[in-house]
């Protein structure tokens, strides 16, 4: 029998983080530390979970933030919920619990982006899954929808040879213009922060780097 629960992120942190770490789709974005970080930037956090025989089996760390001058509140689940996506009963109970939690917090929009590979859940199955649980797929994503995994064991020449010609051209062009790559340290954080701020400004204004 499934037991439902809801709690602020500050409670039972160790148990929740252990659940996230052990889950096959677990992510930094569902951890206590991520909730603490987001809370510093205007988000609030709530956890919804399911237990079976006293053990956590599914759940979601939901982030909330007001949009449009406080008129609308958004509920967002990055890289979640964490669940057994083949267990329809579990998913139905979990999404109902999430919907209720979002409603109680005044959210007018719920967005979730599970950390699933396409071979686990192809796009057509995604669409059906969203609709079964009251949602709809969206092309507007917050988290990067794709990840590139590169095997670093071959030689550099072999790795480059496996890339598209345009990619190789851009890499060599950057080298000719003096671009270098190195591992950063804590001393680089201020410069990185300035770069991120400038990138965000360009994104919001529609300008391009020059």
What is each of the regions a protein language model found here?
Residues 2-71, 114-121, 128-210:
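A conserved beta-strand-loop-helix scaffold within acyl/acetyltransferase catalytic domains
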Residues 70-140:
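Acyl-donor binding region in acyl/amide transferases
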């Amino acid at each position: 029998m499934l037991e439902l629960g809801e709690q602020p992120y500050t409670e039972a942190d160790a148990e929740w983080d252990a659940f996230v770490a052990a889950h096959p789709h677990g992510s930094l974005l569902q951890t206590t530390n991520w909730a603490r970080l987001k809370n510093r930037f205007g988000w609030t956090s709530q956890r919804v979970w399911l237990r079976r025989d006293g053990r956590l089996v599914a759940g979601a760390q939901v982030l909330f933030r007001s949009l449009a001058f406080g008129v609308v509140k958004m509920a967002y689940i990055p890289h979640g919920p964490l669940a057994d996506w083949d267990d329809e009963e579990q998913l139905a109970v979990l999404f109902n619990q999430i919907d209720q939690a979002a409603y109680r917090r005044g959210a007018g929009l719920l967005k979730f982006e599970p950390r699933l590979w396409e071979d686990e859940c192809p796009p057509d199955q995604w669409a059906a899954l969203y609709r079964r649980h009251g949602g709809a797929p969206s092309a507007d994503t917050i988290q990067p929808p794709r990840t590139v995994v590169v095997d670093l064991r071959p030689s550099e020449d072999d790795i480059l040879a496996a890339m598209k010609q345009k990619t190789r051209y851009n890499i060599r062009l950057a080298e000719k213009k003096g671009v270098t790559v190195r591992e950063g340290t804590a001393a680089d954080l201020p410069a990185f922060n300035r770069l991120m701020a400038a990138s965000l400004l360009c994104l919001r204004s529609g300008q391009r780097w020059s």
